[in-house]
Curated annotation (Swiss-Prot):
Signal peptide: none
Provenance organism: Shewanella sp. (strain ANA-3)
Name of the protein described by the UniProt record: tRNA1(Val) (adenine(37)-N6)-methyltransferase
Similarity comment: family membership: Belongs to the methyltransferase superfamily. tRNA (adenine-N(6)-)-methyltransferase family.
Cysteine disulfide links: none
Gene Ontology, cellular component aspect: cytoplasm
Substrates-to-products reaction catalysed: adenosine(37) in tRNA1(Val) + S-adenosyl-L-methionine = N(6)-methyladenosine(37) in tRNA1(Val) + S-adenosyl-L-homocysteine + H(+)
């Protein structure tokens, strides 16, 4: 399935990782404008990498394990206006973060983790890898972020709301802490079903108990139209906004 944005195009080449609203929200929300070195963990077909390239002047490194997704990511990067700033690593993030050149190197890390923690897996293996947390659970993901993130860097993620408690439990075992939490409601009259998270490293001069900023983002009003919040967030990407 293919999707065209204002400045780039994404074709998932049937890899099982098409453009999602979650990805667009995360890519538009993450504070990337000043980042010089950006890491996209589990890049899929390259959506977050290309959004990051559009929103910054930084160098983008995308890591994707699944072969078909990596091929789609490479294709989309090559076709984009920022091919010279985008690099794909086809491999496991846990291996990548062991390499000395990437340790404490990135000043921003973005990730839209797999989101089905329980229940039946998808029939096709590549789609299952895209959607199920068996491939990269929260603990190894957070360890990779901690290893690759610079001392003053940040990491941005989006999760289903039901995963937040378990994610926070894993987070408390790391040298990372929660800076911002934005609960995302798909419609004004519904409960939040997603959460945007901004993480940072705990420095020697600060405490893990520093207060986290809590806000909300509503995507659509009761009439089904995008809210002013959503329009302001995504207007640089969606063609019809």
């Amino acid at each position: 399935m293919a999707f065209t944005f204002k400045q780039f195009h994404i074709d998932d080449l049937n890899c099982g990782m098409p453009v999602s609203t979650d990805g667009v929200i995360l890519g538009a929300w993450a504070p990337l404008s000043r980042a010089k070195h950006i890491l996209d963990i589990g890049a899929g077909s390259g959506l977050l990498s290309l959004m990051a390239a559009q929103r910054s002047q930084g160098q983008i490194t995308a890591v994707e394990l699944e072969e078909k997704a990596a091929a789609a990511c490479q294709y989309n990067m090559t076709q984009s206006p920022w091919a010279d700033r985008c690099k794909l690593i086809h491999g496991d993030i846990q291996h990548v973060c062991q390499q000395a050149e990437y340790q404490e190197y990135f000043d921003h890390i973005i990730c839209n983790p797999p989101y089905f923690e329980h229940g039946p897996k998808a029939n096709e293996q590549h789609r299952a890898m895209a959607r199920h947390t068996d491939t990269l659970g929260f603990t190894p993901l957070l360890e990779a972020i901690s290893q690759c993130l610079s001392h003053e860097g940040h990491a941005s993620l989006i999760l289903p709301i039901q995963s937040l408690t378990r994610f926070k439990a894993c987070l408390h075992q790391t040298q990372l802490y929660l800076v911002k939490e934005v609960r995302v409601k798909s419609m004004e009259n519904k409960d939040a079903n997603r959460v945007l998270l901004l993480l940072a490293k705990i420095l020697l001069t600060q405490s893990q108990d520093e207060p986290c900023q809590h806000t909300e983002l509503t995507l659509r009003g009761e009439d089904g139209r995008y809210t002013e919040q959503m329009i302001a967030l995504t207007k640089d990407f969606y063609l019809k906004l």
